[in-house]
């Protein structure tokens, strides 16, 4: 899956999970600071990404995923 395809899928999931417009979800968008996620939203978002991409994101790795771009990069690495 290309980086662009991953970004589009992540953007769609983030928009749905956080009830924001997909246009607001940019690679440098911080889940908490820019998109209004709280800690529970972040946990639910990680679970949705795990399911959508059929990967496992350990807690230690999840703590390092603060932006949409971080999520895309992590998923890209897991799929290569």
Swiss-Prot record:
Organism: Prochlorococcus marinus (strain NATL2A)
PTM text: 4'-phosphopantetheine is transferred from CoA to a specific serine of apo-ACP by AcpS. This modification is essential for activity because fatty acids are bound in thioester linkage to the sulfhydryl of the prosthetic group.
Alphabetized Gene3D superfamilies for the sequence: ACP-like
GO molecular function, one term: acyl carrier activity
Subcellular location: Cytoplasm
Record's keyword terms, sorted: Cytoplasm, Fatty acid biosynthesis, Fatty acid metabolism, Lipid biosynthesis, Lipid metabolism, Phosphopantetheine, Phosphoprotein
Function: Carrier of the growing fatty acid chain in fatty acid biosynthesis.
Modified residues (O-(pantetheine 4'-phosphoryl)serine): 39
An example Gene Ontology CC term for this record: cytosol
One Gene Ontology biological process: lipid A biosynthetic process
Segments forming domain Carrier: 4-79
NCBIfam families to which the protein is assigned, alphabetical: acyl_carrier, PRK00982.1-2, PRK00982.1-3, PRK00982.1-4, PRK00982.1-5, PRK12449.1
Family membership: Belongs to the acyl carrier protein (ACP) family.
Pathway(s) it belongs to: Lipid metabolism; fatty acid biosynthesis
Protein name stated in the entry: Acyl carrier protein
HAMAP family reported for this sequence: Acyl_carrier
Pfam annotation, one family: PP-binding
Highest taxon of the lineage: Bacteria
């Amino acid at each position: 899956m290309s980086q662009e395809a991953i970004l589009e899928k992540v953007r769609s999931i983030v928009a749905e999970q956080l009830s924001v417009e997909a246009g607001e979800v940019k690679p440098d968008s911080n889940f908490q600071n820019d998109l209004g996620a709280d800690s529970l939203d972040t946990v639910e978002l990680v679970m949705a990404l795990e399911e959508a991409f059929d990967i496992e994101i350990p807690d230690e790795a999840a703590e390092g995923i603060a932006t949409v771009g971080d999520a895309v990069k992590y998923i890209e690495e897991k799929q290569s």
